[in-house]
């Protein structure tokens, strides 16, 4: 298991854009399972929607991508690199995510070739699918 400090050592995201609270399981370069506790205090709920708060679907996908990035960047040879979001395919949203929900974020890499990886990603709440998609990552280095 990785706590928030360990996650911050692997991926560069920070508040308000760090969307993973802990990682329950990680197989370096292969798969990871993370958790996002969705609270009423999330910044995005100020505008989406004030009278009926719903987590934006794009942020659910971003949370999945961050869990995938942890899996990719946990590998020794990828440490210190960045995992860029390079693509999304077959994305479907099946359930609203609201304050008080706990998102379980599962990403399994299905293909990795060099600096490019593709994975199957599923976000669930209480065992119910909220989002499922395929995401593509491109590993890169920081350019000064």
Curated annotation (Swiss-Prot):
Catalysed reaction equations from the record: a (3R)-hydroxyacyl-[ACP] = a (2E)-enoyl-[ACP] + H2O
GO cellular component: cytoplasm; membrane
Disulfide bonds: none
UniProt cross-references to Gene3D superfamilies, sorted A to Z: Hotdog Thioesterase
Molecular function (Gene Ontology), one example: (3R)-hydroxyacyl-[acyl-carrier-protein] dehydratase activity
Keyword DNA-binding appears in the UniProt entry: no
UniProt protein name: 3-hydroxyacyl-[acyl-carrier-protein] dehydratase FabZ
């Amino acid at each position: 298991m990785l706590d928030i400090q360990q996650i911050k050592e692997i991926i560069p995201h920070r508040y308000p854009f760090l969307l993973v609270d802990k990682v329950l399981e990680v197989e370096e370069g292969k798969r990871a399972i993370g958790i996002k506790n969705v609270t009423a205090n999330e910044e995005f709920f100020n505008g989406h929607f004030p009278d009926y708060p719903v987590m934006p679907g794009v942020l659910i996908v971003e949370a999945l991508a961050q869990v995938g990035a942890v899996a990719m960047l946990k590998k020794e040879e990828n440490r210190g690199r960045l995992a860029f979001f390079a693509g999304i395919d077959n994305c479907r949203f099946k359930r609203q995510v609201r304050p008080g929900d706990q998102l379980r974020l599962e990403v399994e890499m299905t293909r990795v070739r060099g600096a490019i990886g593709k994975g199957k990603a599923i976000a669930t709440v209480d065992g119910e699918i909220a989002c499922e998609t395929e995401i593509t990552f491109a590993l890169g280095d920081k350019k000064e």
